Amino acid sequence: MTLPVIYGELAPWFHLLTPPEHYEDDAAAVMGFLRERVEGRLETLLELGSGGGNTASHLRRDLRVTLTDLSRPMLDLSETINPGVEHLVGDMRTLRLGRTFDAVLIHDAICYMTSETDLRAAMTTAFEHLRPGGAAVLMPDHVRETLEPATDHGGEDDPPQADGRPGRGLRYLEWTTDPDPADSTYQVDYAVLVRHADGSVEVHHDRHVEGLFSRQTWLDLLAGVGFETWTAVDAYQRDVFIGRRPA
């Protein structure tokens, strides 16, 4: 899997694209789903596709977390806000750590599973890393029933430099489209401007191809792997899928 520019060359800028403090509500929602569905203790969590560690920076207040991602640069960034937390490079489709956890989280990184085969593989990884009674939370950005063309924009700045000049800055435009409604993908194009501390500015185009599946497909695949299944909706009206490994 080729890494998007945002997770490779631009990884050191990621917290200006999406700041960790914006993920406190997501983390609270994850904890709520887990407390409702995990049987027994809830102390450890494995995150697959943890990226810059934004959600984990809040979850680790309550849980002992292990973070995995395909991108070493993203894990390096995560370590700056999650010191002392275990960080491991790994592919959510094939990772096998040889141990189990009370919970598994796959946040929006699950969007990069663009076929049912890949999605099933990621779900199997989650199942294999759960103890009996443990639960997994999967949080795609879209399901087939909810995807609509959309645009978004944002970005943040670092604090000013010691001499008063602006620090680094980033701004982005995000454009979500579905070029072929008959297939299992949609695409998100980013136009990203980054301003270096010396004032120079670069422009990047980054296309993300992401998976799109119906709610029933999600539930059928989870059940096929062996999960007991539930659905929920988060504060942003996004579908959330929850699976528990039978005790």
Positions of predicted regions on the chain:
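Conserved class I S-adenosyl-L-methionine
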Residues: 1-43
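Class I SAM-dependent methyltransferase SAM/SAH-binding core
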Residues: 44-46, 51-94
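SAM-dependent methyltransferase
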Residues: 137-217
